[in-house]
Amino acid sequence: MVYFSDIFNVDESILESYGAMNISLLNDIPLFIDPFLLYASEKPEYRQLHENILDYLSFLRDKASGFISSEKIKRWYTFPEVKQNWLGYSESGNGGLGLGKDFGQSMSKAIQGVFPDLKNEKITETSHLEKLSLFKVGVGRDNISDFTCNLIKKYLLEYTQTFAMQYLSLEQCKNIAVSKVYFDYKYENWMSQKYILPYFNGDYVILTPKDLLTKDETWINASEMRHRLLDITSSLPNDELRDQINDIYLKQLTKKKITNKLMNEAAANTIARFPILMDYYIKIKEEEKENAKNVSKEVVLSVDEVFIR
């Protein structure tokens, strides 16, 4: 047996009532954290985590207006993968690439253009980290999930420590100094902190709440945005702009054989020309936030049944 409940001799019902995923400690489970679920939640602590992410993005955006040295990019943008949560798509074990120099450089160059109205949005209810993945700036789904996991790591560590102190013996845990736990805005640096955490096979373990997890794609994603271009365009309040965008999109589909690839390329070209469409797409996704929570429940249940039960 390789699951957390087996290794630490905890009944599955205890993990279930706590709300934590019963992770495998042999291979990653194909789930990841979707930051949209923080925004969509009614839990005050999740909504605060969403705000904390925006605060850090605001810090990065403001700093991006000047010169950023490679040392600061490394300090502010690069993170190791939080492999101790045993989530992701590794074929064996729980190793991953994390967020390295390429991610840091891509994001530092893009952040001002992607978030001109950060925390002061005029179309959407709020800002969303996932907007970075809608631009072709070298930031994809895995980057978004890894970045989110690092930005809420303090919460996840506290969540795990609380469980460990309540349900595990001291022999099953270890007092660990974890790096890059929280950001000190006074010193502009990530700080370490100690936690009492479950310990197995030479490393600590992090538990993750089920209601933060999804599979395949984040709720806000570029693939669906391209697929729903006509829906997005129809939601525009400006009739003239809506007609102009439709004309530009349809003129790219004049070939006799209209393929999915051609439609995808036409949608991508149109969105690149009218980036305001991204904001209206995000607005639609905000309005559908209850569906995001339902999808999360369904995919977590399906993974639970296939990989655990």
What residue ranges belong to the model's regions?
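Long, contiguous, compositionally biased segments that the model treats as domain-scale units
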Residues: 1-171
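The feature marks a conserved, polyanion-engaging helical scaffold used by nucleic-acid processing enzymes
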Residues: 176, 180-309
